[in-house]
Design a protein with these regions (language model features):
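Catalytic beta-strand/loop cores that center a nucleophilic Ser/Cys/Thr
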Residues: 71, 78-157
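Cell-surface, membrane-associated systems
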Residues: 155-157, 162-165
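Cysteine-nucleophile active-site neighborhood
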Residues: 1-84
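Single conserved hydrophobic/aromatic residue that forms the stacking wall/gate
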Residues: 163-166, 170-173
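General alpha-helical segment detector with a strong preference for membrane-spanning helices
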Residues: 34-35, 108, 171
Length: 173
């Protein structure tokens, strides 16, 4: 079964849903992101159904899969929405890049094309993997897990929920 499925059925999820409706910020990292995805809180479709998946990593270079599963490295992320779109990015600059640890096996965002287009329109595609110059590329190592649209973090439409597969909590700086 997918990571986060069982936890997404726990009673605490109803509390998180109620608090998010009040606009309270909720930040899901790694397994927390998987729980938010499985609960339907993010991206927050009207029926709270699971509409996004976090799948096994696939490192792809020149159209070939060069690795799968667990990967650990530092990643560059680029803010790809206006900074006031979420409670978590309001102090960042437009197109700001951050460098954070990446350490997981199941963080590859898979999103249906129609939902991805809706999320882009709603400024929910918050951070995308990029290289040191800010260029977004689907090639490994820039995109370390093969995520659709190079996504590293997405939010709900109101911006109070953010989830990310890279793990800023692992930053020892």
């Amino acid at each position: 079964s997918r990571a986060g499925v069982i936890a997404s059925l726990e009673p605490i999820i109803n509390t998180l849903k109620n608090e998010s409706k009040k606009g309270k910020p909720i930040f899901g990292i790694c397994t927390g992101a998987q729980i938010l995805v499985e609960s339907g809180l993010v991206p927050g479709t009207s029926d709270d159904q699971t509409s996004v998946a976090l799948a096994d990593n696939k490192r792809i270079k020149s159209g070939e899969v060069v690795g799968t599963g667990y990967y650990n490295a530092w990643s560059n992320l680029k803010l790809s929405v206006p900074q006031n779109s979420t409670a978590f990015t309001r102090h960042l600059s437009e197109n700001e890049m951050i460098n954070i640890p990446f350490a997981h096996a199941e963080g590859r965002f898979i999103i249906p094309d129609d939902l991805l287009e809706e999320m882009k329109t709603n400024d929910q595609t918050v951070f995308r993997y990029c290289d040191y110059n800010g260029k977004v590329s689907s090639e490994f190592p820039t995109n370390p897990n093969g995520s659709d649209y190079n996504l590293a973090a997405i939010s709900n439409a109101s911006g109070c929920l953010l989830y990310t597969s890279p793990s800023p909590r692992d930053n020892r700086v």
